[in-house]
UniProtKB/Swiss-Prot annotation:
Subcellular location: Cytoplasm
Species this protein is from: Clarkia williamsonii
Listed GO biological process terms: gluconeogenesis; glucose 6-phosphate metabolic process; glycolytic process
MF (Gene Ontology): carbohydrate derivative binding; glucose-6-phosphate isomerase activity; monosaccharide binding
Name of the protein in question: Glucose-6-phosphate isomerase, cytosolic 1
Amino acid sequence: MASPALISETEAWKDLKAHLEGIKMTHLRELMGDTERCQSMMLEFDNIFLDYSRQQASPDTISKLYRLADAAHLKQKIDHMYNGDHINSTENRSVLHVALRAPRNLAICSDGKNVVPDVWNVLDKIKDFSDRVRNGSWIGATGKELKDVIAVGIGGSFLGPLFVHTALQTDPEASKNARGRELRFLANVDPIDVARNISGLSPETTLVVVVSKTFTTAETMLNARTLREWISSALGPSAVAKHMVAVSTNIPLVEKFGIDPNNAFAFWDWVGGRYSVCSAVGVLPLSLQYGFAVVEKFLQGAHSIDQHFSSAPFEKNIPVLLGLLSVWNVSFLGYPARAILPYSQALEKLAPHIQQVSMESNGKGVSIDGLPLPFESGEIDFGEPGTNGQHSFYQLIHQGRVIPCDFIGVVKSQQPVYLKGEVVNNHDELMSNFFAQPDALAYGKTPEQLKKENVSEHLIPHKTFTGNRPSISLLLPTLDAYRIGQLLAIYEHRVAVQGFVWGINSFDQWGVELGKSLATQVRKQLHGSRVKGEPVEGFNFSTKTLLTRYLEATSDVPADPSTLLPNI
């Protein structure tokens, strides 16, 4: 008998649907009262502790989710990914970001070729180059050391490296290595982003890293040309070769741009943009800032989770469990969003990065075979570090819509503070909230409890908390480069698990193309209107009205202006 075309047609899915009503009738207050259940929903790997006991799930739910994983052939799909099979079927590509952090002695193949030696050739080149820049043997055109780096990229070429950079900034080892250095990321084509990036920097001491696989990405290349002009207008055109390097596979265009092709760092088609932080995309700028040794620890941390994900049984597998629970929350309980709530300011850029990894990967409406999905898939991801988020959107999470939450805590702060006479230290104050919030969401507060506290009758409806709001708690021992790598890989693989179970292609992103193609038409119209005075034509009434209004209000912009750079 042929396998069902959609996971929702399997008996395992239907069994979970039937099981759902009983779970909906059971409050988390009752579920949390079962100590044996709670113990069964705790897991530890390499001193990372996961507690998922505050999920709206029983041990029977978890067993049924494992059966769903089997029905989706989850283990086989994971193996296919690690074996280099072309699981990105719409682009006919392998998906091998795990190879980017593999040790030298490991063999991971794509199309019959072990790609790990190629990866390490690039890593060795990055180490050599970043060492030379950091020790002053590679200098700028005027003989000054290059202490400042601007990485130019967008999407996956920006969000992942920015997350890691922000997390490392306050790590003691990394911050010591970065002393006297500056790393900035230029992503938005908005000239304000250019102005902010070059503000306070001198072209003489700045190295620009242009990140574009094809070297044709519109926003990135316009920003790259802008910084090229910033450098060449101050130092002369020949300075570009000393002040700009590339992460790209298109060597002819790199050379045409004015960058020495020897200073181009490769990556491959089997690396998706949102999974590219462990490639030269992230490793080069991060190594320039923190030194290769620190970044290598980050890669080792990611690899440790890669091994765990590929080898641990499902019941002891952190990414698998998190992925299955997300499927449960989205497709069965009907919760469309997830809040990522790290109780560490160093992780302030985690949620924006995972937002892209998750929503670009799993924001699909059809199966990998092109069939419309008859169930909800994908999550709306957002988040903010605690306790900032508590004074922002937690109100809605507690008393509005139900939004499953990921609470991420760190046992030892990167930068501990102790004040004599305080009841608790600063990190304990932070962690008090980390431990309290999941219980507040799970248990809530009943009208009966409020009456016992003599709360006024008219305020009881306003002060009632329904509870029964699911969350997971992930506790990391520290937040160094190794643990940051682990955290990244946990979320990357969790997203893959969701896609594998839903039966979608988590590794393409056709949804970003339509807007880009329409922008090409608008770009052509703006040029024609400014240079030739052409009327706005070929658009619907709304767009025509907006475009005309914009052109009229900017009629003072010259058709062929002289170069003007930000002045800030």
